[in-house]
Amino acid sequence: SEMCIRDSFLAKQLDNFLHRNPATADALKKRIEQNERERKELAGIKKLANERAKKANLHNKKLRDCRVHLNDELPAKNKEAFIATQKDTTIFITEGDSASGSITKSRNVDTQAVFSLRGKPLNSFGETKKVVYQNEEFNLLQHALNIEDGLEGLRYNNIVIATDADVDGMHIRLLLMTFFLQFFPDLVKKGHVYILETPLFRVRNKQETIYCYDETEKQAATKKLGNKPEITRFKGLGEISPEEFGRFIGRDIRLQPVILEQGDHIQEFLGYYMGKNTMERQDFIINNLRVELDLID
């Protein structure tokens, strides 16, 4: 048949190419053998980890789930309205009890879920897929998202990394982004991953309260309210009350999309920022170090 002829032709061309390029053939052989070893190693780990995750999911203390999910079956009536609600489904990935508590108390229980991390997650750069199953938090997160076998069963349209705006919070963001880029890059490519922007300052007087997301906004608010308004700097998400937090994850939510540019450069990108601490990276940090100054006395 035509397909057999085509397959035979391709096999012959590939065979000729590999004979002419022994280095490529050797690299391909090693890669195939490595994949086979990883596949066998992963099979046993997956079975054990999935059994643990199923038990944990029944009483998953890390997940405060919502009522509607992206992968829910459509109802017989009001399909368009239900699809619109599904597009709003969001899971906030937070760190620590105080931050997750504030979001949990102020969220929309129909469409907003909360997954709480315990401290900083593992740096998964350079790890194989087995770490997703061996690391309890990653395994539970994978099951909460329902992405083990692909994105078809994804339970939330928006995956929002919600961390403090300090150095530790930024590090946790990078660790989570590394996890998604390393093992689930399609989540990023298809626009499902975001960073939650939360205000750094609250500027208020007796008549008005203004929330500011950077120093420039703070200066403008201070000038607008005049007469020495009260200025509060939020050091962490846990310092924002649930009543206030509801404003920042509601209709006026500010989300920064995680965008992956076209090209096969994920590993190079992650290697530079999340790999070994090279002299090149040390020089970059020294040359680009910025000290934050409060511009208003």
Task: Give residue spans per PLM region.
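Alpha-helical scaffold elements adjacent to nucleotide-binding pockets in ATP/GTP-utilizing enzyme cores
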Residues: 9, 13, 137-140, 171-179, ...
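Short hinge/gating elements
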Residues: 1-2, 62-63, 124-128, 158-166, ...
